[in-house]
Amino acid sequence: MKKRLVAIVMGCMLALTAVGCGADKNAQTAVESTESNAAESAETETTSDSNTEAETEENAEDSTDETADADDTSSSDVTTDRSGNAITLPENVENIISMSPSTTRILIDLGLADNIVACDTYSFASYGTELTEDIPQFDMMTPDQEQIIALGADIIFTTGMSASHGTDVFEAVRESGACVADIPSSASLKDIEDDITFIGECVGKSAEADAIVADMQQKIEELAEIGRSIPEEEKKTVLFELFTPSADNPIIYTAGNGTYINEMLEIIGAKNVAASETDQWPALSEESAVASNPDVILTADMYTPDVINTILTMSGWENVNAVKNAEVYQLSSDAVNQPNHHVIDAMIEMATSIYPEKYESVALDDAA
C-alpha cells in the first residue's frame, strides 16, 4: 500500500514540477490532495616533463593509476549542476545523499548503493531493500537541513521537485558549504541521458554511466527502427494517464507535448491524444478524454485497486475504442514516472502492449 501511495504522489509531483513554479492551480491542488490522502491512508590532467624513457614510463604508469583511482571516487571537470548553478566537487566523493528516486536508482545501478548515507522518503519506499538498513530519510519538500548538514555528505543530489513551491528548501545546506547538485525534472530522453552522464561525472563513475547511456541509446534505436516501419494509417492513438479519474477527482493528468513520455510514444509509432496540448502535463476532463476516443489507454496508476477493470467499467467510457476492445494496460509506475534509464523498461511495456505482434522480438529482460 505504501508504494502505491508513493506512486500516485510522485505522479502528481512530476506533473507539477515539469511545468515549473508557475504550474496551474489544479495540478498543485492534486498534489496537495494526494499527499493528504496518503497521510490519511497510512541525491590536473597529469603530464610528465621527464627527459628519460624510464622516467616517462614510470610517470605514465603513475598517471594511469591515479586516473583509475580518481574514476572510482571523484571528477574534476564538473563546475555547474544540471540547473546551471555553480558547484565545487570535493576531491573525493564517498558519502552521498540522494533526494530523488530517479537519482537514487541511477546511483544504485552505478554500484553506489552502499555510498548513499541518506535519501528522500520516496527513494526509500521504492528502493529501501537495496539501500543500507535504517539510513536517515528526509521529506523531499521540507527536508531537515540541520540534520543533512550534520551528516557531512560529500555531495547532495536534489531535484526540481523540491523547489516546486518556489522556495529553495536546501538554502541552508548550500550556505554551509556542502556540495548541492540540483537535477531538474527531465523533459526529454536526451535530458535523461545527460543526467546520467552528469551523475557519473560527479561520483567518479563516468565509464559506468557512459555504458548505461550507450545501452539506453541502443535500445531506443531498436524500438525506433520498428516504430518507423509502422504505416501512418496503422498508428494507434493512445491516452496515457498518471492516475484514474474518480467521482472525487474527475480530472485526468496526462503527458502532453514536450515530455519524454510523449517522445517515447512517438518513437514506438503511436499517437498521443494529448500531443497537441499546450501544457506539458495537461489536466483533461473526462469529457475531453472520452471525446479523444483513444485506441489504447496506458495507465501508470498503481493506487486504484483492480485499475484495469475499473477503467473498463467506468460509466460513460463504454464507447471508447480502448474500452470496447479491452486495450487498457498498466505500466510500471516507477519505470515511467522516474526519469532515468529505466524509462526504457516503460517504453518496451508501451510498445509490446500497443503493438504486440510488431514488437514480439523485443524482450523486457533486455531493457536498461
Can you name each region flagged by the protein language model?
Residues 3-10, 20-104, 206-240, 293, ...:
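Bacterial Sec-exported substrate-binding components of ABC uptake systems
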Residues 95-151, 155-162, 270-273, 301:
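A short, structured surface patch at a secondary-structure boundary
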Residues 121-125, 251-281:
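Alpha-helical, coiled-coil/dimerization segments enriched in small aliphatic residues
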Residues 160-161, 242, 277, 300-304, ...:
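Short secondary-structure boundary segments
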Residues 164-168, 184-198, 231-260, 305:
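Extracytoplasmic ligand-binding site segments that recognize negatively charged/polar headgroups
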